[in-house]
Amino acid sequence: MPKTSKRLASLVNKIEERAYEPLEAIKLVKENATAKFDETVEAHARLGIDPKYTDQQLRTTVALPHGTGQTVRIAVITRGEKVAEAKAAGAELAGDEDLVETISKGEMDFDLLIATPDMMPKVAKLGRVLGPRGLMPNPKAGTVTTDLAAAINEFKAGKLEFRADRTGIVHVRFGKASFSEGNLLDNLKTLQETIDRNKPSGAKGRYWKSLYVTSTMGPSVEVDIAALQDINKDG
């Protein structure tokens, strides 16, 4: 443990306490991702919202152009021929009441749960186990749907759901340290645009308080939000 602390301290010393240009911030994160595995790169955005008010909540999805670099394990709660359809589309788990029963026991070997609308009354009873993990299917997030194949393909390709936590901070993984700087920047830009586009109606004052990017084992680097917003993806 002390070895890790010493390593992290030396990396922190490389970073100045200021907001960096987006590409510069990503370069620093990549340089500091020196662990022996391919570290996940994450964004942490502090927003000027208070999610205890319903008109200041943020929950949506983003389709990252270059994916997350992670394998997403998907479970689907449905019935009849839709079970076979979900499995054929690539879902790791699919079932009806049997899967509901398995989940109710706390067995959740998946990262994302999709349900068809007809199964939601049964899924709603799983709120106690699904809610704290952020796994409850939601129509706004695209996880309550009858078009299972399309939803499974989108989430496998890099679409992901995110929400602001109770303190108004959004935590999103947007790639791997092995990604090119350009691909990480594309993904981060897409995330910023999604957060701006879904600004809650009740948000007051300054919407973006801060934005940091980091890798699994590396230090955080602050990003200049205005500079990120000014980037023209088509330019």
Swiss-Prot record:
Extract the InterPro entries matched here: Ribosom_uL1_bac-type (IPR005878), Ribosomal_uL1 (IPR002143), Ribosomal_uL1-like (IPR023674), Ribosomal_uL1/biogenesis (IPR028364), Ribosomal_uL1_3-a/b-sand (IPR016095), Ribosomal_uL1_CS (IPR023673)
Q: Which GO terms describe its cellular component?
A: large ribosomal subunit
List the Pfam families hit by this protein, alphabetically: Ribosomal_L1
A GO BP entry is: translation
For whether the record's keyword set contains Transmembrane helix, the answer is: no
Record key words, sorted: Repressor, Ribonucleoprotein, Ribosomal protein, RNA-binding, rRNA-binding, Translation regulation, tRNA-binding
Origin superkingdom:
Bacteria
Q: Which Gene3D superfamilies match?
A: 3.30.190.20, 3.40.50.790
Give the GO molecular function terms: rRNA binding; structural constituent of ribosome; tRNA binding
The subunit field of the Swiss-Prot or TrEMBL record says: Part of the 50S ribosomal subunit.
Please give the function described in this protein's UniProt entry.
Binds directly to 23S rRNA. The L1 stalk is quite mobile in the ribosome, and is involved in E site tRNA release.
The similarity annotation says:
Belongs to the universal ribosomal protein uL1 family.
What is the name of the protein in this document? Answer: Large ribosomal subunit protein uL1
